[in-house]
Amino acid sequence: MTNGVVAFGEILMRLSPDGYSRFKTADRYDVYFGGAEANSAETLSQLGIDSRFVTKLPANALGDGAVTSLNRFGVDTSFIVRGGDRIGLYFLESGTAQRPAMTIYDRAGSAMAGAEASDFNWDQIFEGADWFQFSGITPALSDEMAECTLLALKKAKEKGLTTSCDLNYRSKMWAPEKAREVMGKLLPFVDYFIANDKDVLGIYDNHTWTESDPKKRAEEMEIWLTEQFGFKAATIILVVSDELKRKGTWASLYENGKFYSSPFFLADMVESVGAGDTYAGAFIAARKKGMTDQDAVNYSAATSALKFSVPGDANILNEKEVLALVNRSADDWISR
């Protein structure tokens, strides 16, 4: 790997009832592998950026399946630690019409949740890398993983790597007070902060934000968080509606005291899982490709919108498709 991105976190095996079946009547399940940092690493690789995913997986066929799922996207898995009793699971029932999606986690006691800081040799892991990415899910796994993430961040800064964090707050994993405490120790070591507004609202529920205008609220969040933690830049991705009530993505970037916002990208809903992770991966790719601030936020929001068209956790795309979406008119929806 040369000038690549190291992503650190847990990859889960996902089981989803076929189509729009309900959990209580399903007799067939589709299987996917995914996780916040893994999804970002897969996006990076497809956009031409070397990526390395670091985790701990059981030394069994299910762990092998997770590794294979990463390899097929070109992600380096050479530093995945093998051991522990089980892979984390989650179950996703797809929503439709007025019925929202439903998620059930079964990740307690997973190999990664039980991992120790000594499992990971960061001097070796960071060889050939110039960027370190994690999300708020990793330190939420256990106190040990919170400490391990802090050690990794300190080592990354010591070695001169750029660092980024996708906030990814999960209320089923920890309370806002605990999340604020732990993330408050990690975020001062972060250069680029990435989030959606709901995750910021979830953790920083003790702060007052604008309620009526999501875009204005995103900008308030970016300013406040940058002032609190000293980020080089903060960017927030939103799922919003246009004047016809169609869903789509919009993103804001705050860097060097200036705001940059993307156009609205229509996102017809096949599946939303992984859209934020895709945004994080695309944003890192844009920074590494040397794009301007405006081009970076446009590129990242477009990549996220494309994820809504793909089932499963991972986005399946190429850069040509992303650039076509960024550049085409709203009426040009057929590639000929």
Predicted features, each with a name:
Residues 50-137, 322-336:
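Conserved N-terminal subdomain of the carbohydrate kinase-like
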Residues 53, 163-165, 193:
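Hydrophobic faces of well-ordered beta-strands that scaffold small-molecule active sites
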Residues 1-75, 96, 115-118, 268-269, ...:
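Glycine-rich phosphate/adenosyl-contacting loop at the front of the ribokinase-like
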Residues 7-21, 246-261:
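Acidic-glycine-rich active-site phosphate/pyrophosphate-binding loop
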Residues 173-256:
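Conserved phosphate/ATP/ADP-binding segment of small-molecule kinases
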Residues 148-160, 182-189:
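Catalytic-core regions built around general acid/base machinery
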Residues 259, 263-329:
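Conserved post-catalytic alpha-helical subdomain immediately downstream of the catalytic base
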Residues 157-162, 229-232:
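A short helix->loop->beta-strand "cap" motif at the edges of active sites that frequently abuts
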